[in-house]
Amino acid sequence: MSEIADKVKKIVVEHLGVEESKVTPEASFIDDLGADSLDTVELVMAFEEAFSVEIPEDAAEKIATVKDAIDYIEKQKAA
Amino acid sequence: MFRLDGKTALVTGASGGIGAAIARTLHAQGARVVLSGTREAVLAAVAGEIAPDGERVHVCPADLSDPAAADALVSAAEVAAGAPLDILVNNAGLTRDGLAIRMKDEDWNRVMEVDLAAPFRLCRAVLKGMLRRRAGRIVSIASIVGVTGNAGQANYAAAKAGMIGMSKSLAQEAGSRGVTVNVVAPGFIQTAMTDVLSDTQREKLLGGIPLGRMGKPEDIAASVAYLVSDEAGWITGTTLNVNGGMAMP
């Protein structure tokens, strides 16, 4: 797993207080990990801070799963 | 009841009569208080009067008409107090009165900026930490005119009504994290400004107040102390009208 994926996973575990094993790439924050809308906003803000990226509102709306987050951040970092 | 031991509170506009009374009351209930305002010397004097030994009292001056000041103030307050903020009291405000047909954009904008935008920015800044910690209390000091309107105060009334709508929205956003957001809307409070009223003016004013007297800064401070206490944990999005019965919305 990439360094970014590791860090995303760690943030999700920490923020949502879920078991690490549940944080699979396909896991949906809301449907599988018990997040509410406020959690997802807080997660996006935590990603922004941790990776020094800006995630605009329309992009943030599309981040539903762990993989979505990893992909988006990897793309931003590669650009 | 209503003890605030171990809690840290930021009070803006703490150099004014109401702000100083709020800070004094929260401190007396056991809170650590950070006083903010534009007049550093007055803040220092209020701090000295609250706790001559400087125990649990800090001063962080800020000019909230600067958009960057709100974030900076929250950081500075947490550094000064050595603890995250549990309580925010948005009390700072100003007036630029005048009948609407003669009101300048500048006077409208300045009141909106200091009385509505700055409290919003302070709420936003403290909410991040409060949501994470699953606890927090925000109380904003509006005004009876935000509920009733007042000739000559279109800007001030709009800003204070805006504060009420904002607080109700924030209360809904933050409720699931145990953070409450409420408003206290004071009526006529005895201050240097109302001391100069003529006897006739005073009589007329008092005639509209069922409880027959003007409010004291301590009347406002006591309601704030209640709303920020653990005991008020099931009250959010409400506006407490503290006005002697002058308006009963």
Swiss-Prot record, chain A:
Signal peptide: none annotated. The keyword Phosphoprotein applies. GO terms for biological process: lipid A biosynthetic process. Gene3D superfamilies: ACP-like. Keywords: Cytoplasm, Fatty acid biosynthesis, Fatty acid metabolism, Lipid biosynthesis, Lipid metabolism, Phosphopantetheine, Phosphoprotein. One of its GO terms (molecular function) is acyl binding. Residues 2-77 form the Carrier domain. It comes from the Bacteria. InterPro entries: ACP, ACP-like_sf, PP-bd_ACP, Ppantetheine_attach_site. The modification O-(pantetheine 4'-phosphoryl)serine is found at residue 37. Belongs to the acyl carrier protein (ACP) family. This is Acyl carrier protein. It comes from Gluconacetobacter diazotrophicus (strain ATCC 49037 / DSM 5601 / CCUG 37298 / CIP 103539 / LMG 7603 / PAl5). The lineage of its organism: Bacteria, Pseudomonadati, Pseudomonadota, Alphaproteobacteria, Acetobacterales. The gene is acpP.
